[in-house]
Amino acid sequence: MSARWTTAVLDPQITGGLAVARSPDGFLVDANGALFPRDWLKRQDLDVLCEHGIGHFDGQPVFLLELRSATDVPGCSWRGLRAFMLEGDFDTYKVLGYAAQIGTWAREHRFCGSCGQAMTQIRWERAMYCQPCDLRSYPRISPSMIVLVTRGDEILLARSPRFVTGVYSTLAGFAEPGESAEDCLVREVREEVAVEVQNIQYVGSQCWPFPHSMMLGFHAEYAGGDIVMQPDEIEDAQWFSVHDLPPLPAGRSIARYLIDLYVARRLGLPEPVLPR
């Protein structure tokens, strides 16, 4: 079965297709969702900052209209990306997640970071170009590790002050320059909870467009140490039995997948599938 959504660099000069409109308030939606006939959308009174061709959905070309600000459109409203992640069609969420990352990049790279002059959009490549500096800027992707640390029937979960009240999750952190994903994992676990790990195994990955992370998921076994929480980063961290877990992250997140996968294997239950 072919994928409903595939990314591609499309020339905005071509006509027709579908389009999504994104503002600082989220994506424009109506009763049918966030994908609109492009010609209709461009006839609306929208404050367009730029337009990018981003791919194909069900065989139709898709474009992003990145807006300077939200505009009232009759019969429509604005909806944040996280709401699409939590519910509705996951293929549509993938379109919007990609669009959000391209929109963030386009908004933040209008001017050259070296000389300050306006950059131009390259039509055949996903890049912005500064001619005086001969410099190309590509969409930013931030590699991050996320790990479930286990000890038999116990899993190590923590909560950040930024989490929804009561929710516990796996440990995670951004990779530093010159650092492998495994080195990042060991360092982040040590920094956040002062625990050592062993037998690191890669599990899977997930795009996390909030705003531009690539989450690399791992499982690791406890090797030693007592939990000492990192100030300002970790509000609480505990070992939880797979039989008695606290409130967990959203079901479509890789954090939840890592937890559900381990619990299923310990309890002999059907294994979950990571949304991609």
Swiss-Prot record:
What are the residue boundaries of the Nudix hydrolase domain, all occurrences included? 139-262
GO biological process terms on file: NAD catabolic process; NADH metabolic process; NADP catabolic process
Q: Which reaction does it catalyse?
A: a 5'-end NAD(+)-phospho-ribonucleoside in mRNA + H2O = a 5'-end phospho-adenosine-phospho-ribonucleoside in mRNA + beta-nicotinamide D-ribonucleotide + 2 H(+); NAD(+) + H2O = beta-nicotinamide D-ribonucleotide + AMP + 2 H(+); NADH + H2O = reduced beta-nicotinamide D-ribonucleotide + AMP + 2 H(+)
Function (record text): mRNA decapping enzyme that specifically removes the nicotinamide adenine dinucleotide (NAD) cap from a subset of mRNAs by hydrolyzing the diphosphate linkage to produce nicotinamide mononucleotide (NMN) and 5' monophosphate mRNA. The NAD-cap is present at the 5'-end of some mRNAs and stabilizes RNA against 5'-processing. Has preference for mRNAs with a 5'-end purine. Catalyzes the hydrolysis of a broad range of dinucleotide pyrophosphates.
Cofactor(s) this protein requires? Mg(2+); Mn(2+); Zn(2+)
Name the record gives this protein: NAD-capped RNA hydrolase NudC
> Motif Nudix box residues?
173-194
Q: Which residues does a divalent metal cation 1 bind?
A: A172, E192, E233
Write out the similarity annotation. Belongs to the Nudix hydrolase family. NudC subfamily.
Q: Which organism is it from?
A: Pseudomonas putida (strain GB-1)
A Pfam family per the record: NUDIX-like
Which terms are listed as keywords in the entry?
Answer: Hydrolase, Magnesium, Manganese, Metal-binding, NAD, Zinc
Under the heading HAMAP family, the entry gives: Nudix_NudC (MF_00297)
Gene Ontology terms: cellular component? cytosol
> What InterPro entries does the database record attribute to this sequence?
NAD-cap_RNA_hydrolase_NudC (IPR050241), NADH_PPase-like_N (IPR015375), NudC-like_C (IPR049734), NUDIX_hydrolase-like_dom_sf (IPR015797), NUDIX_hydrolase_dom (IPR000086), RNA_Hydrolase_NudC (IPR022925), Znr_NADH_PPase (IPR015376)
**Entries under NCBIfam families matching the protein:** PRK00241.1
The record, for PROSITE patterns, names: NUDIX (PS51462)
Q: What is its EC number?
A: 3.6.1.-, 3.6.1.22
Q: Please name the gene that encodes this protein.
A: nudC
Q: Which annotated residues bind Zn(2+)?
A: C112, C115, C130, C133
Any one Gene Ontology MF annotation carried by this entry is:
manganese ion binding
Quote the record's binding site residues for a divalent metal cation 2: E188
Source organism phylogeny? Bacteria, Pseudomonadati, Pseudomonadota, Gammaproteobacteria, Pseudomonadales
Which residues does a divalent metal cation 3 bind? E188, E192, E233
